[in-house]
């Protein structure tokens, strides 16, 4: 089913966005 492929791709994309967001927040909050 294409639905499973779409769901998997969406989850992977969401995880990547969350990772980038967390990394950006850490860099922004860090005193460095």
Swiss-Prot record:
GO molecular function, one term: electron transfer activity
Protein name from the UniProt record: Cytochrome b6-f complex subunit 7
An annotated GO cellular component: cytochrome b6f complex
The organism of origin for this protein: Acaryochloris marina (strain MBIC 11017)
Keywords for the protein's UniProt record, in alphabetical order: Electron transport, Membrane, Photosynthesis, Thylakoid, Transmembrane, Transmembrane helix, Transport
GO biological-process terms attached to the record: photosynthesis
Lineage of the organism: Bacteria, Bacillati, Cyanobacteriota, Cyanophyceae, Acaryochloridales
General function of this protein: Component of the cytochrome b6-f complex, which mediates electron transfer between photosystem II (PSII) and photosystem I (PSI), cyclic electron flow around PSI, and state transitions.
Keyword Membrane (UniProt): yes
Known partners and oligomeric status: The 4 large subunits of the cytochrome b6-f complex are cytochrome b6, subunit IV (17 kDa polypeptide, PetD), cytochrome f and the Rieske protein, while the 4 small subunits are PetG, PetL, PetM and PetN. The complex functions as a dimer.
Family designation: Belongs to the PetM family.
Superkingdom in the source lineage: Bacteria
Annotated localization: Cellular thylakoid membrane
Membrane spanning stretches: 9-27
InterPro entries noted in UniProt: PetM_cyt_b6/f_cplx_su7 (IPR012595)
GN (gene name): petM
Lipid bilayer topology: Single-pass membrane protein
């Amino acid at each position: 089913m294409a639905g499973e492929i779409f769901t998997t791709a969406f989850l992977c994309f969401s995880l990547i966005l969350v990772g980038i967001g967390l990394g950006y927040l850490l860099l922004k909050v860090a005193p460095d």
